[in-house]
């Protein structure tokens, strides 16, 4: 089974919006998406699976017997979530380490649907965009002003997380650059030492050769 990685460079910011798309897969295909997420950030994944109907030349919504296996791995390649869901659902998880989170999806379709083409609608929401404020206002009985203040506070918190994540990325990049420069320096020194040793050995060898031939 071949992984098809679709890199989604979705850096969070205040203007960051949800990512909505759809893609086609067969029964044996596996699609993976990369989402860069700060730590302690909520991610919501909404999806819907449709089965291709050759009679109507279209896709049937909510086909029975079709589900999706969803697996989420964090930046340390640890499994955050792995389970089988129905043909339509909403998945939620919270990141505990900053960095790239890989979201992989593949069909768990039975032999009845073997070889069929599927269309998967996918919507990924990160941070404040993953919060249903209408539901929050209803549950906590917030006024419009209180809800707006809550949204602003969440935005400030998300901006802080994003800034911390950017600093983390800059520090990691700096360490990588310093490590690369150090390796290049040591490799250059090693090459220089090898060349000097080879030159010295060749000179000794030539001197011995000339002495043996009584040319010097």
Swiss-Prot record:
Name used for this protein in its record: Transmembrane emp24 domain-containing protein eca
GO BP field: dorsal/ventral pattern formation
Motif (Prevents secretion from ER): 213-216
Keyword field contains Magnesium: no
Family statement drawn from the similarity comment of this UniProt entry: Belongs to the EMP24/GP25L family.
Signal peptide region: 1-20
Membrane topology of this protein: Single-pass type I membrane protein
Cytoplasmic side: 204-216
Stretches assigned to the GOLD domain: 30-126
Source taxon at top rank: Eukaryota
Transmembrane segments: 184-203
GO CC terms: endoplasmic reticulum membrane
Coiled coil: 134-164
Localization of this protein: Endoplasmic reticulum membrane
SMART domains, per the entry: EMP24_GP25L
Role, per record: Eca and bai are essential, though not redundant, for dorsoventral patterning of the embryo. Specifically required during early embryogenesis for the activity of maternal tkv, while the zygotic tkv is not affected. Involved in Golgi organization.
Native organism: Drosophila yakuba
Keywords in alphabetical order: Coiled coil, Developmental protein, Endoplasmic reticulum, Membrane, Signal, Transmembrane, Transmembrane helix
Gene: eca
Ranges facing Lumenal side: 21-183
């Amino acid at each position: 089974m071949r992984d098809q990685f679709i890199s989604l460079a979705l850096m969070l910011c205040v203007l960051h919006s949800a990512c909505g798309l759809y893609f086609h897969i067969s029964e044996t295909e596996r699609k993976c998406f990369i989402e860069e997420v700060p730590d302690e950030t909520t991610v919501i994944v909404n999806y819907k699976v449709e089965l291709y109907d050759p009679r109507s030349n279209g896709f049937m919504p909510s086909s029975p017997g079709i589900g999706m296996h969803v697996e989420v791995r964090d930046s340390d390649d640890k499994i955050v979530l792995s389970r089988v869901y129905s043909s339509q659902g909403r998945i939620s998880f919270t990141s505990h380490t900053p960095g790239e989170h890989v979201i992989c999806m593949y069909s768990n379709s039975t032999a009845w649907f073997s070889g069929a083409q599927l269309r998967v609608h996918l919507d990924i929401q990160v941070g404040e965009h993953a919060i249903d404020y209408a539901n929050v206002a209803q549950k906590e009985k917030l006024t419009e002003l209180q809800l707006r203040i809550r949204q602003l506070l969440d935005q400030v918190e998300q901006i802080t997380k994003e800034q911390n994540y950017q600093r983390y990325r800059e520090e990691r990049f700096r360490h990588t650059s310093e490590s690369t420069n150090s390796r290049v320096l040591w490799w250059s020194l090693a090459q220089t030492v090898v060349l000097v040793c080879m030159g010295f050995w060749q000179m000794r060898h030539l001197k011995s050769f000339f002495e043996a031939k009584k040319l010097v």
